[in-house]
């Protein structure tokens, strides 16, 4: 139960759904966690009460805001003294519809949160890891199977998740070529049973999944334990698809 002992992880969108599942797995394995949310402040307070003030910190932040990133990283260092792991998990589904009907405002909001937020996270996490963690660490970008194939009625979401996939590749290669021991990988969930899945469509969704059921947040948490731990020291610039064989 100590695979992440003494590690400090920052998990955006970490107070509900997949993010909370990752946080629960990280706490179980001995990590200290900094959790963020833009709107769900009550969820953040509940998470800290559950995990303990000595092991967790909640920071309200907008991942698309550069100043919020600087503030959150500083609060992480002030509380725990270093940063070992960044999980870029926060995201939105965006507005559905064909590309010709999508407004620029709706497009930009999805890109700002899902892609620009990940860029800002990488930028400031790398700086902190270099300064406070001996230039060593792990960055995990939560993309989606929609980052591997296009969804016809979710063009902004698909673009943001595909962009996250290639941002992961570019950053991993850049750091490796610099001989900096900060690994960057992406995780691509399929359908995961969270509150955002419409109940009326559950049967239809499950019928498309070869294993016969949706995944759970813990399924993403477990792969993130591996990627955050020293066990994955040779995993870099890789894509981990967790979708019950849906895209096989």
Residue ranges and their predicted role:
Residues 144:
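Residue(s) in the substrate-gating loop at a strand-loop-helix junction
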Residues 127, 173-177, 233:
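Alpha-helical segment proximal to the catalytic Tyr-Lys
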Residues 176-183, 235-237:
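Short, small/polar-rich loop/turn modules that mediate ligand/substrate recognition or access, typified
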Residues 122, 160, 168:
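Active-site helix of classical SDR
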Residues 97-99, 103-111, 205:
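Substrate-binding pocket helix/loop in short-chain dehydrogenase/reductase
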Residues 8, 15-17:
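Conserved glycine-rich cofactor-binding loop
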Residues 93-96, 149, 211, 225, ...:
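Short C-terminal tail/terminal secondary-structure segment
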């Amino acid at each position: 139960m100590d695979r992440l002992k003494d590690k400090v992880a920052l998990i955006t969108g970490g107070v509900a759904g997949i993010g909370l599942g990752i946080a629960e797995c990280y706490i179980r394995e001995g990590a200290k966690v900094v959790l963020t949310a833009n709107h769900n402040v009550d969820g953040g307070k509940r998470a800290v009460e559950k995990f303990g003030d000595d092991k967790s910190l909640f920071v309200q932040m907008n991942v698309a805001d550069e100043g919020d990133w600087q503030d959150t990283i500083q609060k992480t260092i002030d509380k725990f003294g270093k940063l070992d792991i960044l999980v870029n998990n926060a995201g939105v589904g965006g507005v559905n519809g064909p590309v010709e009907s999508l407004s620029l405002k709706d497009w930009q909001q999805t890109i700002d949160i899902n892609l620009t937020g990940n860029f800002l996270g990488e930028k400031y996490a790398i700086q902190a890891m270099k300064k406070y963690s001996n230039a060593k660490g792990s960055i995990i970008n939560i993309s989606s199977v929609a980052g591997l194939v296009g969804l016809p009625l979710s063009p902004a979401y698909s673009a943001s998740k595909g962009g996250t996939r290639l941002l992961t590749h570019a950053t991993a290669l850049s750091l490796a070529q610099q001989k900096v021991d900060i690994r960057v990988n992406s995780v691509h969930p399929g359908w995961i049973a969270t509150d955002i899945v419409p109940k009326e469509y559950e049967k239809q969704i499950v019928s498309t999944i070869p294993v016969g059921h949706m995944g759970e947040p813990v399924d993403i948490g477990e792969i993130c334990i591996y990627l955050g731990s020293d066990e994955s020291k040779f995993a870099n610039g890789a894509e981990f698809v967790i979708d019950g064989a849906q895209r096989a």
